[in-house]
Amino acid sequence: MNRRELLKKAGFLTTSVAVFGLAGCNSNDDDPVNLPFLKKYRFPQGVMAADPKPDSIILWTRVVDPNDDDIKEVPSTRANVKVMLEVSMTEAFTDALATPITLTAQAMYDNTIRHKLTGLNPATTYYYRFRAEAGVSRVGRFKTAPALNADVAALNFAFMACQDWSVNHWIGLSALVTHNLDFVVHLGDYIYEAAGDSYQSEKVEGLHTKIIMPSNSRKPNNSEAQIAVTTEDYRYLYKKYRSDERLQALHARFALIAIWDDHEFSDDCWQNNETYTNGTIDLTALPLPMSPASDTTAQTPRRRSANRAWFEFMPADIPALDETAADDFKTVKIYRDLQFGKLAHFVMTDERLYRADHIVPEAVDNPATPNVDQLGSIGSRYFVPEDVHGQIQQGKMIAAIKGAFESLPVTDANKLVLGTILTKLQTDPTGASLTAQEQAVFNEVGLALVSVLGETQRKWWKNKMLTSSATWKFWGNEVSLLRMALNLKALPAIVAQGATNPTLNAMINSYL
C-alpha cells in the first residue's frame, strides 16, 4: 500500500489523549492573534462535537485561507494548514490541555478536520476551539456520556431530521439552543441533494440564499431541479447548509449523534440506486456532470461521492472511510451504538446503504395511483393495495428461501428445514401451515430480499437490542415504523405505505 492509498484508507481521522495541567501563561504579548505577520485563517462552518462517550469525543472543523471563499472547494494544490486544538474544562480556557494538539488540514479533504479526543472524564462538560496562525474558531462545548455503570436519573436530548434548506422551519434551531441538553440526535436528511424540486415549494427564508450546484446537474424530466452528482456538489451542500448561523450555534453548544437517510445521496434511494425516474430512462451514456441514470442502473461513483462528503462533514465515531476498491459503494459503515450509563442505550442504524430494492418495483403501474400527474413519484413505492403488497413481499421472501436452500450442501441440517418450508409453500403460499419454528426460519432467511438493514446489520441490531440491559433502548431509525393507511373511495382496498414491512416490524417488536 503506497502513501496515497494509506491516506485514503485512514480517512484523515486522527486520535490523541487529553492530558490536563498547567497551560502556561496567557499573556496577550504571546498571543499569536496579535502577531501581524501571521495569516488570520477562518473557520466558516464553525465547530462540531459528536458521539459523546464516557472517555472520548469526536471534534470537527474546517479551515480556509483568509482570502478564500467560504464555500468553494479548497484548491487541490493548496499546502496543508497546521491547526491547533485547545480543550479546557472552563469556557475561559484557564484550565486547558498542557499542550495544544497539533492537527493538519488537507486540501484533499477540503480542509476539514476530524479528531478523536480520548482520556476524558465521564459526565463532564468541556470547551474547545481551533487555531490556525492568527485565526481562532468560535468556542464549542460538549458533555461526555456518564460511565457505563453509572446510575443516571435523567437524560436530556432532542432529535431532529429533514432540514430542507428551502423550508421555513430553521427558526426552531434558535429555540433549541436555549435548552439544557446533553446532546442532539439527527435522524437523517441533514442535506437535500435536490434544489428547486416540486416538493420544495415553501418560501425560502430571507437568510438563505439560492443553492447553485457546482456541476449544474439537473434532475431527469425536470430541468428546473438541480441535483448533487459530484463530490464537489455534496461538499457544497454541507457547507451551504452549515453557513446558517443558527445551525452553527446548535452544533457549538451540543454534541451531535447523526445518521443519514436518503437525501444525503438521492431521494428514496437504496444502496447505490436512485429512484427519480421509476425506471423509465437511462442516461448512463452521457458524460459527467449529468443527470443520473434510472434506478435500474447502479450509480457507484455518485454514491461514493455522497459517502465521502458525509464522512468529511458529519463527525462520527466510526471506522475510517475506505475508498481502496474503486467499484465498492459501501465505503463507510455508519451504524453504531452509544450508551449513557444504565439509563439509555442508543442503537443507530443505516437503512439506505444495505437495504433491498423496494418491495414493489418502481416501474410497475399502480392501480391505487392512476393519476401520475397529481401523485408523481409517490407511485408504486408508497400507496399500494395491501393484498398486492403482501403477495409481492411473500414472493420475494419465498425466493430468498429457495436461494438459501439451493446454496446449502446436502449434509447441512438447515437444508432439511428449508426444504420442508418450500414444500409446504407450494400448496400454501401464505405460509399458514408453517409451524412456529418454521415460520421463525422463514422470517429470518426470507428477509434477505426485503430487508432495509441487510443481514449483517440486522443481526448486529438484534444482538444489541436483546443483550442491552439499559432501562431505555432507543433505536435511531430514519424510516417510520408506523403504517400509513387510507380508505380510498375509488378503491375498496386498503392501501399501505410501501416503506413498511409487516414481517420485519413484528420481529422488531419482539426484540424491544
Kindly give the residue locations of the regions a language model identified:
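Metal-dependent phosphoester/phosphodiester hydrolase catalytic core
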Residues: 3, 10, 18-19, 29-512
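C-terminal motif of bacterial Sec signal peptides marking the signal peptidase cleavage site
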Residues: 23-24
